[in-house]
Amino acid sequence: MSGDEMIFDPTMSKKKKKKKKPFMLDEEGDTQTEETQPSETKEVEPEPTEDKDLEADEEDTRKKDASDDLDDLNFFNQKKKKKKTKKIFDIDEAEEGVKDLKIESDVQEPTEPEDDLDIMLGNKKKKKKNVKFPDEDEILEKDEALEDEDNKKDDGISFSNQTGPAWAGSERDYTYEELLNRVFNIMREKNPDMVAGEKRKFVMKPPQVVRVGTKKTSFVNFTDICKLLHRQPKHLLAFLLAELGTSGSIDGNNQLVIKGRFQQKQIENVLRRYIKEYVTCHTCRSPDTILQKDTRLYFLQCETCHSRCSVASIKTGFQAVTGKRAQLRAKAN
């Protein structure tokens, strides 16, 4: 309460607490209080210090109100948040800082950037990619293409359908360069001693391969190639089947039917190996040779340089015997 609200009343008197009246036991056992005891009652006189007491009460209330106001102010001040000072961003200073960083990064080489990236970014989940496995035909084509490049560098064997001059079978006139090439080719054929240092080229017809169904392949011009090479069909057939690792036979149309799916490039590679080993001479690389058998060995005799050398025998590769095993199991059961 403030001092304005207090009104001075002279009739008011301060209330005093009542004193407890103890009781005493007489010799006879009766209880006696102060009222029963013979004592003189004292009259309450009004104290002259009532004004002082009222002033003290007013001061106490004023102090309490002031302390309450201070507590409220402190409470509100604690709740108020301090405003952060806004920093002014200068574009020019930022550009200069970026340039300095770039110069420092160019001078200093990065050390182990992969580990830092892993720490910063964390382990990210990698997306699963659908892996497509290539077909057997595509794998074989790639392998055979690499083998062709290697063999063409070493061997002078090539396959082409042209048997005569380039202008044969057409109405166009021949050129001067074509005539020169023809003259030099004739000279080399007639006089092989003139071209001792040069490599000779052996030109062959390409094999004609046709699919028969889904599991067989037909070698159409098999007999024609045997005649061009001056070799027996049995010898060439044994080499083809051993290198390809399959089985096959010659049908009524003189075509070789092979079990399995094969492409023209694969058979060309096998023929190139056969020509290099059993047709061309090992000394002069001439195709004019004769294959002779003497005491279980094959000898290659050249008609141009008259050299004679032995040739490796044909060995069959690994072949699975699933059919025989199946028959043996069936008999055992």
Curated annotation (Swiss-Prot):
Name used for this protein in its record: Eukaryotic translation initiation factor 2 subunit 2
Organism: Homo sapiens (Human)
PANTHER family: EUKARYOTIC TRANSLATION INITIATION FACTOR, EUKARYOTIC TRANSLATION INITIATION FACTOR 2 SUBUNIT 2
Biased composition annotated in UniProt, kind: Basic residues: 13-22
Cross-link (Glycyl lysine isopeptide (Lys-Gly) (interchain with G-Cter in SUMO2)), chain numbering: 102
GO molecular function: mRNA binding; RNA binding; translation factor activity, RNA binding; translation initiation factor activity; translation initiation factor binding; zinc ion binding
Modified residues (Phosphoserine): 2, 13, 67, 105, 158, 218
Family named by the database record: Belongs to the eIF-2-beta/eIF-5 family.
UniProt keyword Protein biosynthesis, yes or no: yes
Gene Ontology BP term (one): translational initiation
Annotated function: Component of the eIF2 complex that functions in the early steps of protein synthesis by forming a ternary complex with GTP and initiator tRNA. This complex binds to a 40S ribosomal subunit, followed by mRNA binding to form the 43S pre-initiation complex (43S PIC). Junction of the 60S ribosomal subunit to form the 80S initiation complex is preceded by hydrolysis of the GTP bound to eIF2 and release of an eIF2-GDP binary complex. In order for eIF2 to recycle and catalyze another round of initiation, the GDP bound to eIF2 must exchange with GTP by way of a reaction catalyzed by eIF2B.
